[in-house]
């Protein structure tokens, strides 16, 4: 069984289903949320801290916005700031248990 902190309350707000698994679950696990702004939905993710931000973005887009054609047109934000190096491990960001990663289109578009 993996070491894990208790699931933060914020992680279960407005999410659906069981948490998605990201990376190896053999060590410590971060309980995160990923929200795709254009999908207006969020998922819970139990992530290995060594998984990359790019892997998290790919998983969230696949689950919440499967019709996306160009993942590189989406940015990942944490605490309001864009994460510029998506190849960095999640542990290298300011993410803690309960953090929410916001994934949104790089360019603002009018509401249809």
Annotate each language-model stretch with its function.
Residues 2-112:
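Ubiquitin system architectures
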């Amino acid at each position: 069984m993996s070491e894990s902190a208790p699931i933060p309350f914020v992680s279960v707000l407005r999410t659906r289903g069981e948490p998605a698994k990201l990376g190896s679950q053999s060590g410590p696990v971060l309980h995160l949320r990923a929200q795709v702004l254009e999908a207006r939905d969020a998922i819970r993710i139990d992530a290995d801290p060594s998984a990359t931000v790019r892997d998290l973005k790919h998983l969230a887009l696949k689950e919440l916005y499967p019709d996306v054609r160009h993942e590189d047109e989406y940015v990942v934000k944490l605490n309001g700031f864009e994460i510029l190096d998506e190849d960095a491990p999640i542990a290298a960001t300011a993410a803690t248990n309960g953090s929410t990663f916001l994934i949104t289109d790089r360019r603002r578009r009018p509401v249809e």
